[in-house]
Amino acid sequence: MAFFPVSLNLRGRRCVVIGEIDNREAIDKAAALRDSGADVRWIIDPASLRDEDVTDAYFVISTPQDEALSARLRALADQHKFLLCCIDQPKYGFVAMTAIAKAGPVRIAIATSGLAPRVGKILRQRLQAAMDERFTRFVERLGGMKLVMQREKPGPEHAAERRAAMIEAADGFDADVHFTYPSWFDAPRG
């Protein structure tokens, strides 16, 4: 199944996380939603979920691997038009969670369409390590330059000039990417 990658502005929007209090996935998802400015409600006992707990939600993330719960949530999502992610059960949801590498204002989402979550995790860890404090300063300086350009040369008639200046400012930035594969991958099949 192919998903379309997108970033959501969840500031002030009602989001619901379903998962027990010690569920690492639920803890991480609730924290990420709060970091995004969402109004988060956490249902720690999936058995106590009432339909009205999710009907006014914008986005619901369900962490239990419970087919009946996921099917029920899908029916509610279809009826009440909220976004739904059922972790490790993509057939029920509209949203697949990505591995996120972040530094300052930069967010890089990594998706493997559910085929290789470990690969996504490794990519996230390596990118996260590469996006150090110097990288963050560089991006923030570019952002400052962009704001100055927009203030000094506003309007669509200067858009090409602003774009060219930003391309020139980033000239010389590069990322060195290299992949290493396990020994079984290149071994002859037989």
Short names for language-model regions:
Residues 16-17, 39-44, 60:
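Short, hydrophobic beta-strand segments that form beta-sheet elements in well-ordered domains
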Residues 114-190:
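An accessory alpha-helical subdomain
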Residues 67-114:
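Rossmann-fold NAD(P)-binding glycine/threonine-rich loop
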Residues 34, 38-52:
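A short, well-structured beta->alpha microelement
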Residues 63-65:
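Glycine-rich, N-terminal phosphate-binding loop of Rossmann-like dinucleotide-binding domains
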Residues 54-59:
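Short acidic/histidine-rich motifs immediately flanking catalytic phosphotransfer sites
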Residues 2-31, 138-153, 158, 190:
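Glycine-rich adenosine-cofactor-binding loop
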